[in-house]
């Protein structure tokens, strides 16, 4: 499975994240409000984001999200933890968007593109979300994510441990879910 495809929608282009994207992506990430509810709420700080960016490049699977109208990078997301066993699964996450693109359908289109690609190869897509990140949890529910009873683990952040929950979207849920119907 290609974890760094080029995906194009009506308003968005998703393409592999490259080292040359640093300045444009950090311009988005340097807004503290982007990370306000995120467990790693200090990610707007340059040294913290540099480590995050380097990890994204090293791990592979990271995508730059581009507004087709302006040509600007407006965020990023990743496909990680591909497991072909048992029908296959992959995790989509590490997503953030410029505040100018909150609430207007950008996340919906981005996730629809990523899910349509991933679900050609796997039966299930998982999303680990910070337990207290209510903005991301609401966004998951809007796109048809189902909260599972699987433990999302604890991630160590600058402010201490942060518990995560796991949402999932299966191939069948996606085919008949809100991303297909409106």
Q: Model-found features: residue ranges?
A:
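GNAT-family acyltransferases
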Residues: 1-104, 117-119, 124-125, 131-134, ...
């Amino acid at each position: 499975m290609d974890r760094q495809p080029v995906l194009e929608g009506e308003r968005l282009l998703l393409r592999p994240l490259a080292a040359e994207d640093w300045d444009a992506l950090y311009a988005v990430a340097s807004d503290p409000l982007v990370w306000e509810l995120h467990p790693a709420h200090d990610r707007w700080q340059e040294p913290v984001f540099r480590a995050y960016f380097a990890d994204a490049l090293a791990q592979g699977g990271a995508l730059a999200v581009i507004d087709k109208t302006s040509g600007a990078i407006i965020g990023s997301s990743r496909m990680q933890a591909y497991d072909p066993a048992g029908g296959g699964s992959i995790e989509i996450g590490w997503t953030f968007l410029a505040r100018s693109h909150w609430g207007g359908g950008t996340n919906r289109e981005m996730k629809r593109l990523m899910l349509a690609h991933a679900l050609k190869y796997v039966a299930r897509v998982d999303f680990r979300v910070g337990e207290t990140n209510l903005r991301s949890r609401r966004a998951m529910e809007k796109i048809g994510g189902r909260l599972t009873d699987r433990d999302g683990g604890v991630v160590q952040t600058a402010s201490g441990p942060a518990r995560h929950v796991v949402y999932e979207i299966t191939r069948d849920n996606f085919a008949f879910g809100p991303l297909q119907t409106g």
